[in-house]
């Protein structure tokens, strides 16, 4: 009887352990995306995004590797030739967002600078690095 109980405990531990590994692996591979529309020009990491629709994509696996993890495309699809800017974001814990949020500040009259963005349902916000040299890739 003791050996059966021990076997069941070991089996449960293995099952629980494997589930947590799968969850951790799926979080690393997670990609999030959202489309937003700007009604005026916005500066993002030194690049001016003109009025229009943009796709924001965040790749958690790239972030874990220290690579550029944020990609912003003109339009609503991740088309390479429509890539406007990519960079390695700075994660910030925030309250859970009910919708996709853009946080920006007016740096001078008529100039709005995007400082961070947060996906719906997430508690992690993605801040834009303050240095233009931090993991930047700009397509002009």
Predicted features and spans:
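Short acidic, Pro/Gly- and aromatic-enriched capping/linker segments at domain boundaries
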Residues: 24-43
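Bacterial N-terminal signal peptides that target proteins for export
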Residues: 1-9
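Bacterial N-terminal signal peptides
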Residues: 8-18
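A short tyrosine-centered beta-strand micro-motif
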Residues: 52-56
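C-terminal partner/receptor-binding element of secreted or periplasmic proteins
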Residues: 107-140
């Amino acid at each position: 009887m003791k050996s059966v109980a021990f076997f069941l405990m070991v089996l449960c531990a293995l099952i629980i352990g494997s589930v947590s590994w799968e969850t951790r692996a799926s979080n690393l591979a997670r990609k999030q995306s959202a489309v937003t529309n700007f009604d005026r020009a916005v500066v993002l990491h030194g690049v001016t995004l003109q009025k229009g629709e943009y796709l924001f994509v965040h790749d958690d696996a790239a972030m874990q590797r220290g690579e550029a993890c944020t990609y912003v495309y003109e339009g609503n699809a991740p088309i390479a030739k429509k890539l406007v800017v990519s960079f390695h974001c700075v994660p910030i814990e925030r309250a859970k967002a009910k919708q996709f949020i853009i946080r920006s500040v007016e740096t001078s009259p008529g100039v709005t600078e995007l400082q961070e963005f947060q996906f719906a349902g997430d508690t992690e916000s993605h801040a834009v690095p303050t240095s233009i040299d931090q993991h930047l890739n700009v397509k002009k």
